[in-house]
């Protein structure tokens, strides 16, 4: 009986894959709904439905992924929740998905994840003229991260401003604030000197005038 059930399960997935390949959305979802009666974890059900909808470029997939990730979070399965958002973000650069991913990485204090998700979110927000939203995000996250991560995060923000917001009239202020954060960190941890130099190198490649101003600011501050 178990072998029969396993074979039926496998056949059902082959049918779903076939319907997806043939572009038959409703038939794929019909088989999926029948199959989900045998799946005990709701998060998996929503995640798989999101995968099917995503294959048909249906924006409803994002809603399913949000539900799946929230269910994983409630169950304490943080890595699964992050994986759902990462998967969704690979196929759809969505502001809400990337904001949720950023918040997840903040919660688990994953520095690389925090920085990478913020960079991706910054690009979208600045292209949509939502700079103030990003500034609020920086303020909100500042109480949740260490000083070094905060400096690196502001460096990402400055880079994004120079890349995607040519009208950023307050760029000098943001650069000076980022330099202050780095210099404060360097008082206690010289290992982050390379991070400051990376920031200056990026600045030089993107805006030579601001780079020269940054060097002057550092020389006056030290």
Regions found by a protein language model. Give the residues of each.
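Repeat-based scaffolding regions
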Residues: 1-222
